[in-house]
Amino acid sequence: DYPKLTFTTS
């Protein structure tokens, strides 16, 4: 989840 996991910019 990009909105939640901002560090995980897949």
From Swiss-Prot:
The keyword Nucleotide-binding does not apply. Keywords: Apoptosis, Disulfide bond, Glycoprotein, Plant defense, Toxin. Glycosylated. It comes from the Eukaryota. GO terms for biological process: defense response. GO terms for molecular function: toxin activity. Heterodimer of an A chain and a B chain; disulfide-linked. This is Malanin chain A. It comes from Malania oleifera. The lineage of its organism: Eukaryota, Viridiplantae, Streptophyta, Embryophyta, Tracheophyta.
